């Protein structure tokens, strides 16, 4: 049997990047990306989209912890936190509980299209991303 040992990542093992991800209608959503400093392997992404702020803001400002589940942090993920449309540092108009629109209307936006556009950007722009995304 082959034994593998997961690296135990802590907040000190991550670097932070802040980006604005452009949606299909041109609105830019503020996004904090926390990537493991170890670039020797590829990692899955866990993304949180929230109306309640992804602070702390500032590329050199790290949170006290990336998430409450320390086992996930220790396992090594790319963590992505995004201010939802129209909230905090993101552009656009916030609409609480907006119903999803039909995919046939390419100009209308909702939380589904914003998630899709974000996932697409991550897939195309993140280095060391293994292609797996989970949203929490």
Predicted features by range, described:
Residues 127-136:
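Alpha/beta-hydrolase fold nucleophile elbow
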């Amino acid at each position: 049997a082959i034994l593998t040992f997961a690296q135990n990542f802590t907040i000190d093992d991550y670097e932070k990047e802040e980006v604005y991800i452009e949606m299909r209608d041109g609105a830019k959503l503020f996004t904090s990306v926390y990537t493991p400093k170890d670039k020797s392997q590829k990692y899955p992404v866990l993304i949180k989209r929230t109306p309640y702020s992804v602070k702390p803001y500032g590329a050199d400002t790290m949170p006290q912890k990336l998430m409450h589940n320390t086992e996930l942090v220790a396992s090594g993920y790319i963590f992505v936190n995004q201010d939802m449309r129209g909230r905090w540092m993101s552009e656009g108009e916030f609409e609480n509980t907006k119903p999803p629109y039909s995919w046939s209307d390419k100009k209308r936006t909702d939380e589904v299209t914003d998630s899709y556009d974000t996932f697409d950007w991550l897939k195309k722009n993140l280095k060391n991303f293994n292609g797996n995304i989970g949203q929490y």
